[in-house]
Amino acid sequence: MITAIAFTGSAVTDMPRARAFYEGVLGLKPAEEMAGGKWVEYQVGGGTFALTTIDPRWTPSDQGTAVAFEVDDLGTMVETVKRSGASISMEKSETPVCWIAIVHDPDGNKVVLHTRKAA
């Protein structure tokens, strides 16, 4: 029986470049670094997000799975991402329940920026 999501992770090819994006652009704070810096964890809203270069079989991809980060101010975050030069595949868009944008980290992994509307 599944009881929780242990972590969500994204494979990257260049850890310093990835950390510059996730920490410098998105503002995540590293919580733990393991395996000689090949695994970095961030605590985000009660969950764990990890970056890894630990296994060459786990490769970056812009297909399929993505992590979605809840943000306070989606417009400001999208502008910050634009200034960084990162790729944006979906500008800030409205749905019935939220605002959403899709950006890509330096390896092309999808990163969803999300703000839920007030109920």
Segments predicted by a language model, with ranges:
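Short glycine-enriched loop/turn motifs at secondary-structure junctions
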Residues: M1-A4, W58-G64, E94-T95
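N-terminal beta-strand motif that seeds the catalytic metal site of vicinal oxygen chelate
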Residues: M1-R17, G46, T65-V67, K117-A119
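Core segments of cupin and vicinal oxygen chelate
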Residues: G9-F49
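Short secondary-structure boundary/capping segments
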Residues: A31-E32, V40-E41, R57-P60, K92
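Short hydrophobic/aromatic beta-strand element in the GNAT-like acyltransferase core
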Residues: E41, A68, I100-I102
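Short, charged/polar, Gly/Pro-enriched secondary-structure boundary elements
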Residues: G46-L51, T59, D107-V111
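Vicinal oxygen chelate
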Residues: V78-A119
